[in-house]
Amino acid sequence: MRPAKRIGKLTTARVTAVTNDQGTNAKIVAAGTVPWRIKSGQLQVLLIHRPQYDDWSWPKGRLDPHETLPETAWRETKEEVGLRLTLGIPLGVIRYKTSNGNNRKEVWYWAARVIDQRPKPDANEVDETRWASVEEATKLLTKKLDKKPLKVLAEAYEAHHLATIPFIVLRQAKAIPAESWTKDEVDRPLADSGYTQAKAVAKLLRGWAPTRIVTSKYTRSLETIAPFVKKYGGAVRNKKWVNLRTVKAHPNFMAKRLRTEFKRHEPTLVCAQPSVTKRILKEIKSWVREDRHAVVNPKHVYTEKKSNLSPGSILVVHRATHLSGKIVSVERYEPYVN
């Protein structure tokens, strides 16, 4: 597939208190992170030096074939500085024309916290890394545009929005049609295209590394999460409140259990049937409204047309670890499937 056409297929929507990113609008698209840590009570960020350009910037790179933007950001950070990080809140997009002036380029950024890891430059594209305070980084960065994600990160830190825990909602991948299945509905499996979606979403989920995985006992839901669990691990929990019958019979119970899962202090993934994910999204939408000062323009993620997820797609909600526990970002993505 031609790069421009491939990029045009990306489904991306992200909102935070200060960013609002809707889809791609450039021939060249890249993604990266601003790695950060707290050292002696001070916020520090990790910059990289690229010998080819003799500049200081952030870990980033262009999309590989069959990648989504979050996957690119995660992979490039691992390749350039040897860090396996969990993606945090979005830090916006920088846009500019390439040096020859013929093409528009976008770079999508995420915050990524570093805990108990030491950066290792790849000695090819990156020959040096340096931890710096926000003030030092502002002076050290070569390109003015690279200061934009740093500014967003610093503002999030001051607002207690930077340290977060991801909560992910995954709609099960495409199942074979109900009318063509004669056995127990619980055992209805994924379609061939659904298995392909499940493998693709496993790569996408890697960026947030959920360790607790909640799903129903339905075969198609279990098959959706199977590729991720097999490759990356995670504790799978079969819960009745995720079953459609339970949700229909006891909607308040579902809402209560959902809130309990959301408040856990570990990255959590909930995988469910389409009717259930639609109700989950409706519930989360009400939480976003309650925390509306922390997320701007949630309508770009929640509209009538976007009231549910497509098969195999995800909603990522970040909750601040600060005492307020506010929702500080909402993102939705589809896995890349040929």
Task: Annotate each PLM feature.
Residues 8, 13-45, 166-168:
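Conserved N-terminal beta-strand and adjoining loop/helix that marks the start
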Residues 63-89, 94-145:
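Unchanged
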Residues 35, 47-49, 109-113, 131, ...:
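Short, well-ordered beta-strand micro-motif
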Residues 41-84, 181-188, 193:
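Conserved Nudix-box catalytic region and its N-terminal flanking loop in Nudix hydrolases
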Residues 166-168, 264-272:
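Generic beta-sheet signal
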Residues 2, 54-55, 119-177:
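Nudix hydrolase/Nudix homology domain
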Residues 61, 72, 162-249, 278, ...:
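Active-site-proximal alpha-helix that buttresses catalytic centers in soluble enzyme cores
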